[in-house]
Regions:
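Catalytic cores of enzyme domains
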Residues: 1-135
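Alpha-helical scaffold domains
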Residues: 86, 94-208
């Protein structure tokens, strides 16, 4: 969820460097959609370069449509607020269906990018290197649920999850444990139910 007023994808399309794929991501030929976009704002008028691309190259591919856990790709209008990536970052209350949709995800969802043929090479060559070494083996859900503020900052400050705050990540870890009915989830509940007003983060309380 970007917080800035400028939509980089739209400018990138107008510049002709790529197209908006069926999964709503900017796809750049040879690079796919796992890219970071930046803007340079000028106070002088410049003539734009000719567009390098003026059409979508998704063709008849439906991989992202079929893989989307929220089942929103390919439908108009695109319901961005139902996207699982959005839900994992939202501080708003989640419905029971949305909670189930998160599955084991605690932050973000790249399923529609992971299945995209245009990302095949990038997934193989570079995606793993984009994660901090401390997170490459995954995240322990119960450990995440019990993180102190200092521990959260130390582990997640350099990731996209760092800016969203500890509460959101812990809520998602709690829901992930609940979704798989992990025995540790039931143990955690028993340990906290006697004094949940003090021990349970407020953002988790509605889901107990």
């Amino acid at each position: 969820m970007d917080t800035g007023p400028l939509v980089e994808r739209a400018f990138a399309v107008r510049a002709g460097i790529g197209w908006i794929g069926r999964n709503q991501h900017l796809i750049i030929p040879g690079y796919g959609s796992f890219v970071a976009l930046g803007l340079l704002l000028l106070d002088v008028k410049v003539e734009p370069d000719p567009s390098l691309l003026d059409r979508s190259l998704c063709g008849v591919c439906q991989r992202c449509v079929e893989a989307c856990p929220a089942l929103i790709i390919g439908k108009e209008p695109f319901a961005a607020k139902h996207c699982v990536s959005y839900l994992t970052q939202s501080k708003e209350g989640l419905t029971d269906e949305e909670c189930k949709r998160l599955g084991l995800r605690i932050f973000g969802c790249d399923t529609c990018q992971e299945v995209c043929p245009h990302n095949r090479k990038r997934m193989k060559d570079e995606q793993t290197d984009s994660f901090p070494s401390s997170l490459r083996r995954g995240v322990d859900l119960l450990e995440t649920l019990n993180l102190t503020k200092a521990e959260f900052q130390q582990r997640f400050h350099s990731t996209a999850a760092g800016w969203r705050g500890k509460g959101v990540l812990q809520r998602n870890a709690f829901l992930a444990l609940r979704n798989v009915q992990d025995s540790r989830y039931r143990l955690w509940l028993r340990e906290h139910e006697k004094d949940k007003d003090k021990l349970v983060p407020p953002i988790i309380s509605p889901y107990l």
